[in-house]
């Protein structure tokens, strides 16, 4: 199995929220929650991709897992039937990445039911990266979104 760019991008984004993640949730959702449980993110990647995770599994250090994937030019993932690890290979080199028990991870167990949105807007990854760069430069962690009055 190969991971789509969309999934890799979602996982890279979610690692900034929490290094723990559980994958293989029904419906193709990828969800993450901060360790303080004050921030939650959810991405529905299944309709865009031609596969389903074979089973639910946990990753303790998502950054490490992504770094392992990045060691290969075009990695292929083969999930073990014992549900304990995935083999990552490029046809020449391979290694096993062992899963974590989902019960010890800080992961969302259910969705938060929110009332209808008061506001909605689109923020591209380029715009978000620009905001993160500005935030790091100015040493601030606050962001304000305001309606432009013309």
Where do the protein language model's features map onto the residues?
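Charge-dense, extended regions
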Residues: 94, 103-104
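Flexible glycine-rich active-site/ligand-binding loops centered on an Asp-His dyad
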Residues: 104-106, 115
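DNA polymerase processivity clamps
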Residues: 1-98, 114-150
């Amino acid at each position: 199995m190969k991971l789509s760019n969309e999934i890799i991008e979602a996982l890279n984004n979610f690692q900034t929220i929490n290094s723990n993640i559980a994958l293989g949730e029904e419906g193709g959702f990828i969800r993450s929650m901060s360790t303080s449980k004050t921030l939650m993110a959810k991405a529905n990647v299944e309709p865009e991709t031609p596969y389903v995770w074979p089973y639910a599994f946990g990753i303790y250090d998502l950054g490490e897992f992504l770094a392992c994937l990045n060691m290969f030019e075009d990695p292929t993932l083969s999930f073990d039937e014992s549900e304990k690890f995935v083999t990552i290979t490029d046809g020449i080199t391979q290694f096993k990445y062992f899963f974590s028990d989902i019960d010890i991870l800080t992961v969302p167990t259910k969705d938060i039911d929110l009332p209808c949105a008061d506001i909605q807007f689109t923020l591209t990854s380029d715009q978000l990266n620009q905001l993160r760069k500005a935030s790091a430069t100015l040493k601030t962690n606050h962001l304000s979104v305001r309606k432009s009055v013309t």
